[in-house]
């Protein structure tokens, strides 16, 4: 065991004693320069292009940036346009306006009371109280559970009234109302009071509450597509066109006022809109292909229209213009993919942001070994299904990181920062420890995991001698004689 671990083991026997930073950016291992730039970019709202191989912390940096930006202050809604329904309006509400509306809506909910606290006539007419025996039950019960009589007697009683009441109750026919309106004296004037059924309770609405309801009903109907209380981090890796840019759902009734759904109700925001005032993270951005130009347009205009993407859909005729899309773009790619990033998009990032080359190794120092221990503790804590690791086992993980830096990156006396695969090795060792019933991941568990956790190409070479030999031996004789790629039409004659 190295000197570093001898000193450290005297104080901490395993990785459970290692404190995990609360700051998300401090959990990124070995990318100090990138972390500093990311903090500046978050504060100044600059774009980022992270370049490097998989597993070096690109997504962690992007996600951590969302903790350093202010909370969203705007909610985006689409409002019905009575004159031209296919062109809904955009409405932007500030946080203060949204909170005020919520308070107003809460004030229109009225007072919830127990049916026994309501006037007897109200409880009977709403179906809570049996008019014969006075027993209270659910308004969904047509027959009183206490006396087995219809809870509500029909208003017009003929010679066969009782018979009709019994038959109606037997078939679930109820005469109770959903709402009862009464008047009461309030000072020098009469006040209208409305009693409504509310599950097994009664909602009471006074005149002031009813007036607030009327004011709300006069407002144009709207739909919130980007709520105020949203996650400022939006992941759009591998997103389709509709997921990225939004869409308008199809209506089989063509938006018919009576049968269909109005256009504004079918509008769906895309990732560029959901990331408004937040971070839009796109890993492997070159996989978006031509969609990159739409990202560029949104970055330039800070708005992007929502329209139906399917020309065969009823939503194709609907368009919402100038939907806000003011986001911080954090794009990531591998070094080999740099030529495939749209040139104007990259220019836009450089003109209002930074390009960062991620490191793949760091010096093998005591300080960096401590960071490795932090990484091991983080991986175990995030997994939640494996035990912590002894210092002897952790030393093997660090030595494996040193070995990979030498083999992959040709760097001596350095530690690899391609940590995703090391995380897999830690989990494999943890699974072995769990299978054995160990309370901690021991040195032997890591040694066994290292033997198992090797690339499949290495296993193939060991088993078959070479990849070419493996390819040739994969198919049986019958498959070689009749292989799909060598078929011609005569095979079916």
Swiss-Prot record:
Record GO terms (molecular function): ATP binding; ATP hydrolysis activity; serine-type peptidase activity
GO biological process: proteolysis; regulation of DNA-templated transcription
Keywords noted in UniProt: ATP-binding, Hydrolase, Nucleotide-binding, Protease, Serine protease
Pfam families: Mg_chelatase, Sigma54_activat
First-tier enzyme category under EC: hydrolase
Enzyme nomenclature, EC number: 3.4.21.-
InterPro entries: AAA+_ATPase, CbbQ/NirQ/NorQ/GpvN, Mg_chelatse_chII-like_cat_dom, P-loop_NTPase, Sigma_54_int
Residues involved in ATP binding: 52-59
Gene3D superfamilies, per the entry: 1.10.8.60, P-loop containing nucleotide triphosphate hydrolases
Similarity section: Belongs to the peptidase S16 family.
Name by which UniProt lists this protein: Putative lon protease homolog
Organism: Thermoplasma acidophilum (strain ATCC 25905 / DSM 1728 / JCM 9062 / NBRC 15155 / AMRC-C165)
């Amino acid at each position: 065991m190295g000197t570093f671990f001898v000193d450290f083991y005297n104080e901490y026997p395993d990785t459970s004693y290692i404190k995990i930073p609360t700051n998300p950016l401090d959990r990124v291992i070995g990318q100090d320069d990138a972390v500093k730039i990311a903090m500046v970019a978050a504060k100044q709202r600059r774009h980022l292009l992270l370049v490097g191989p998989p597993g070096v912390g690109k997504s962690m940096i992007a996600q951590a940036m969302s903790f350093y930006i202010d909370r969203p202050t705007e909610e985006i809604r689409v409002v019905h346009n009575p004159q031209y329904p296919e062109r809904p309006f955009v409405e932007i509400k500030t946080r203060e306006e949204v909170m005020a509306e919520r308070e107003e809506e809460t004030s229109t909910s009225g007072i919830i009371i127990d049916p026994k606290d309501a006037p007897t006539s109200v409880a009977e007419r709403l179906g809570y109280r049996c008019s014969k025996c006075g027993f209270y039950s659910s308004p969904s019960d047509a027959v009183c559970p206490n006396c087995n009589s219809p809870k509500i007697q029909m208003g017009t009683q003929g010679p066969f009234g009782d018979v009709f009441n019994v038959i109606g109750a037997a078939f679930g026919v109820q005469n109770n109302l959903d709402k009862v309106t009464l008047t009461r004296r309030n000072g020098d004037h009469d006040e209208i009071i409305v009693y409504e059924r509310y599950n097994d309770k009664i909602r009471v609405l006074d005149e002031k509450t009813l007036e607030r309801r009327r004011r709300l009903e006069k407002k144009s109907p709207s739909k919130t597509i980007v709520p105020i209380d949203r996650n400022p981090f939006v992941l759009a890796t591998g997103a389709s066109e509709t997921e990225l840019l939004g869409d308008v759902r199809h209506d089989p009734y063509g938006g018919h006022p009576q049968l269909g759904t109005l256009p504004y109700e079918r509008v769906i925001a895309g990732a560029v809109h959901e990331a408004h005032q937040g971070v839009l993270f796109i890993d492997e951005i070159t996989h978006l292909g031509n969609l990159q130009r739409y990202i560029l347009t949104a970055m330039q205009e800070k708005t992007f229209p929502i329209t139906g993407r399917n020309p065969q859909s009823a939503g194709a005729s609907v368009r919402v213009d100038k939907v806000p899309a003011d986001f911080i773009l954090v794009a990531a790619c591998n070094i080999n993919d740099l030529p495939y990033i749209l040139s104007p998009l990259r220019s836009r990032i450089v003109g209002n942001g930074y390009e960062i080359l991620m490191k793949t190794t760091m010096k093998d120092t005591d300080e960096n070994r401590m960071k490795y221990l932090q990484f091991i503790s983080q991986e175990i804590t995030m997994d939640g299904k494996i035990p912590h690791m002894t210092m002897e086992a952790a030393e093997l993980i660090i030595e494996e990181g040193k070995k990979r830096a030498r083999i992959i990156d040709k760097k001596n006396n350095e530690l690899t920062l391609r940590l995703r695969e090391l995380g897999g090795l830690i989990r494999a060792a943890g699974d072995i420890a769990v299978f054995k019933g160990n309370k901690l991941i021991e040195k032997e568990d890591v040694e066994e995991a290292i033997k198992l956790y090797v690339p499949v190409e290495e296993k193939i070479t060991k088993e078959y001698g070479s990849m070419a030999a493996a390819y040739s031996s994969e198919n049986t004789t019958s498959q070689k004689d009749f292989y799909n790629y060598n078929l011609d039409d005569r095979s079916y004659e």
